[in-house]
Amino acid sequence: MQLIKDNYIKKIIKYFYKFIVKMLLFECVIVNKKKIRIKSKIYLVNSQKEAEKNIFLKSYFKNNIEKYDRFKSSKFVFLKKNNDLIASGWICSKKIATWNIEEIDKKINIKNKKILYDFETNKKYRNKGYYTLILILIQNKYLKKNLLIYTQADNYPAVKAITNAGFKFKYSLKKF
């Protein structure tokens, strides 16, 4: 009974949260590769089957089992160091015209663009430039492609990392 009550409360909070949160949308088109001093590489996972085979990712998806559904339209991208997942996120790889930003339940036009979303940096690697690094590596991989990324307006570290990676502010979004 308590679990149902907690779940119901979470749904109510999530519903009202959509009305107060403000999102910022950034865009970037890179023509030339950016130089990076650190030898790093991003890894792309294209399917659930591929993720399940990867021993390194098992714990991530064990804790985030609902994210397996994203493989229908997206690729999982990550940066690793030894056996640690440093930073990760998703790239929508399906050719679709609109994208729903779940936090505010609002659709945006992404025709001929790739959307980057749900990025996360491991707590022990935060504030060390890894989020900026993974975004630059993604830009280098997708040269001459329009890339979009969004974050909450009050997530100052993310806004700083996104702009440091070369993304330009496009506009802010709210539910209404």
Segments (PLM) and residue ranges:
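Conserved active-site alpha-helix within GNAT-family acetyltransferase domains
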Residues: 153-173
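Conserved acyl-donor/pantetheine-binding loop and adjacent beta-alpha core of acyl/acetyltransferases
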Residues: 72-73, 80-115
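Active-site rim helix/loop that mediates acceptor-substrate recognition in acyltransferases
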Residues: 59-82
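Conserved acetyl-CoA-binding loop-helix of GNAT-fold acetyltransferases
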Residues: 118-141, 160-164
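Conserved GNAT acetyl-CoA-binding A-motif
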Residues: 142-154
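Acyl-donor-binding surface of acyltransferase catalytic domains
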Residues: 1-66
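Short coil/turn motifs at secondary-structure junctions
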Residues: 94-96, 124, 154
